[in-house]
Amino acid sequence: MSVANPLRKSIKCVILDLDGTLLNTDGIVCNVLKVSLGKYGKEWDGRETLQIAGKTPFEAASAVVEDYGLPCSPIEFISEISPLFSDQWCNIKALPGANRLIKHLKSNGVPMVLASNSPRESIDAKISFHDGWKDSFSVIIGGDEVRTAKPSPDIFFEAARRLCMEPSSCLVIEDSLPGVTAGKAAEMEVVAVPSLPKQSHLFTAADEVINSLLDLQLEKWGLPPFTDWVEGTLPVDPWYIGGPVIKGFGRGSKVLGIPTANLSTKDYSDLLSEHPAGVYFGWAGLSARGIFKMVMSIGWNPYFSNKEKTIEPWLLHEFSEDFYGEELRLVIVGYIRPEENFPSLESLIAKIHEDRRVAERALDLPMYSSHKNDAYLRSS
């Protein structure tokens, strides 16, 4: 990840993209395209995901129609899928850190603009399901309200004009390449939060690339810093996952000396897609053994080049025997850091043990220790 030089410019406002930056739209898009392409005897395989990210609805529809050889025009395809999308807007969840960021900037009097390639009507419909969002933005601009959509800088110039601010005093937060390109063309500072996995290397034009909004450090840009980090940890809304313990890759104990208790992701792929890759912690309940402190990684483990997103919890207790097949319940209550690659196995192991120490200390704090009594941990 690239790192911004602290306080390079005095930032006075923040311009945010919507889909993929604040809202987890990707899953809805995939589901709608699976249904729509199925009607034509086609199967959505995700190959257009990068090409359509950040594009206008017409551009995205054109790419899908051409690539899959559909017997319809882009306009006709949009007419077919628009009702399907409208039915799903109520189900789109805010991405981790989105509500936190909006509330923090609003409470500190930092003007915010919502600037999306989506039509204005679509933007209003989506954010109507998220309390307080509409009133938090000083300006909302849709792609149909400017002459040329991103990657043209028009939408960002318009945002600065409506706020009566110089473009150089604006910080753009974007998840897609068109958005980053547009922000830099407007001579604004740009933080990229890639919504697609393993694509950070494509965002070299951005001033900073971060893993998720949870990792945003506003003080780098002269903005009021977050104050909710506690002893190297960030509290998150608790989330839950469980199932029988399965055999993993066999490298936890043998290669790393760290015995992880692996869970199948088959039934939790949608849940895992909602959470950024990184290191989390919380409590683990084993049906026949009790409740234990836990630290875990979510992601692709770049050192080992995993092909699929996995979850690998480490129960912070010495067990005398394996417990494959036993029911394991996890309550995740905090975040430590983003996923990262390491130059050596030794540095990876050292970092994992540091994560353990951070988690063990944090879980003694009342704000985290209270979750040890969560009924989910004792369910079977």
Positions of predicted regions on the chain:
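Short helix-capping segments at alpha-helix termini
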Residues: 39-42, 68-72, 131-136, 164-165
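Short beta->alpha linker loops
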Residues: 28, 52-56, 80, 93-97, ...
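Phosphate/ribose-recognition catalytic cores of enzymes acting on nucleotide-derived substrates
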Residues: 239-380
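Asp-based, Mg2+/Mn2+-dependent phosphohydrolase catalytic module
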Residues: 1-12, 103, 119-236
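Metal-dependent phosphoesterase signature
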Residues: 43, 63-100, 108
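Active-site neighborhood of HAD-like aspartate-dependent phosphohydrolases
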Residues: 2-50
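Substrate-recognition element of Asp-dependent hydrolases with the DxDx(T/V) motif
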Residues: 21, 33, 80, 98-128, ...
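Helix-loop "lid/cap" segments that line or gate small-molecule binding pockets
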Residues: 36-37, 56-71, 126, 160
